[in-house]
Amino acid sequence: MNDIMGSTDGYEELPYIKYRKVVADMVELASMKHQMKGKMEVDVTLAREKLRLYKARTGETQSFTAWFVKCVAQAVSENKQIHGLRKGKKIIIFNDVDVLIMIEKMMGKDLVALPYVVRKADKKDIKEVQTEIRAAQKHDLNNPSIMIGSKSWLMDLYPHLPKQVRMLVCKVISRNPHHIKANTGTISVSSIGMIGKVNGWISPISPLPLSFAVCGITKKPGVVEDRIEIREQVALAFAVDHDLIDGAQVTRFLSRLTELMEDGFSLE
């Protein structure tokens, strides 16, 4: 042990990049929420087949993540209270559905996941959502920001502030739903399973009223018209702000989301 502690050959020192401060603050804010958390599986056999047929027909790949964002946005647009935000004695429910996603980028020598908000995702088709995500992935980080597409000086200054000041900024923003929506949207989606194979669930951590983690897609036996068939199932984990919405409303939302996904909603 002494040899390891006394020699640089026994360990490696890495810089604590500024973006990790933002993540730590968001986790701390999320820990203050009273969230309902759950796990589910959805049959995406038809959707995956449509994605494969589209590629065979056009030579272009449609993104599963973009499609999932579209499905979530559609389900939320039909159950808007699910993404409501509290302001004092009122709940503010926005007409537009803004979805925050995480996009991996190189920041210097470090690979980091940076947030990007797809605005009005409910009013865009899959191709528009995908094009926007692809553009964000190619976004130039020569002048790095902690949020892709953000032009806010506060967002760039934020990680350089002392912890007490950062948390004060967060509390001020969190009291105003319009500020929350402008900075982070109202829903977060993390596509963990699109990065690597994940046979299981990883729960999302977010202070937003609704968050999803898209985990792995696996083949499992399922029942279709009383027949056992091999089906493709995607594992989803979710968290909902219980202070703002009840279980029955969450169930209706998840039921609609399941219908959209099983039907391959909006896929050609």
Task: Locate predicted features.
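C-terminal catalytic/motor cores of large multi-domain enzyme assemblies
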Residues: 1-268
